[in-house]
Amino acid sequence: MEYIKKIALYMSVLLLIIFIGGCGNMKDEQKKEEQTNKTDSKEEQIKKSFAKTLDMYPIKNLEDLYDKEGYRDGEFEKGDKGMWVLYSSIVSEFKGESLKSRGMILKLDRNKRTAKGSYIIRELKEDKNHDVQKNEKKYPVKLVNNKIIPTEDVKNEDLKREIENFKLFSQYGEFKSLNTDRITNISYNPNAPNYSAEYKINDDDNNIKQLKNRFNIKSNKNPKLLFKGAGNIKGSSVGYKEIQIIFNRNKEESVSCIDSIEFKPSEGDYNE
């Protein structure tokens, strides 16, 4: 009997040693991972954030986002599944003319599995006193069976077709062949905090071809992809991340595409 007790005690001690050792190894691995994140320079963190954002593209079926989780922080209430906010627009300004933009914002509520937004036409112009005059029109839209449709009557048939045929850049943009070595001009301001980076694109890139074709953009220069963000580099529901594809930006003309995919806390009562 004493012999059996000694064996049982020995086995208990052995298992305890193995368990403690295993926990120690897990902690060591966690420490190594944390240390890696800490030792990453801000430049590397911004590059990774850039690549992670572009990895979301394309979202061919927007309704897939109802089942996709995003980065959550302390701003989310318990039980809130959050919402995806998509924005895409083309902004242009030519010498002697006003700044114009046409685009869309779409909010996909993961709690209610509904998506609503607006097609927005904006025009900004300076008057003789150099005050900026803003003219904005919004046309409410919703997403049904992965199709965007106006929720109110649009009397202008051309505008109605324009809204119905509009595609967010996130629906067709594709960056699977992204080479992080080509990310340049990285900057970080810890006081704001905000950050930015650039990526060189060739004029024959498929994204560029699609944008030119969809919006009748005439430019033979190699565009650049600008990545901008504010808040925590890892993610922040109170900050933002957006991409800009800049075709031209000079005294004569400025043409660019702005696009963003953000995950935010839901608006209103998400338990309805």
Curated annotation (Swiss-Prot):
Lipidated residues (S-diacylglycerol cysteine): C23
Sorted UniProt keywords: Cell membrane, Lipoprotein, Membrane, Palmitate, Signal
InterPro entries attached to this UniProt entry: Csa, Csa_sf
Keyword Plastid attached: no
Signal peptide: 1-22
Covalent lipid sites (N-palmitoyl cysteine): C23
Annotated Gene3D superfamilies: 2.50.20.40
Family: Belongs to the staphylococcal tandem lipoprotein family.
Name of this chain's protein: Uncharacterized lipoprotein SAR0445
Organism this protein belongs to: Staphylococcus aureus (strain MRSA252)
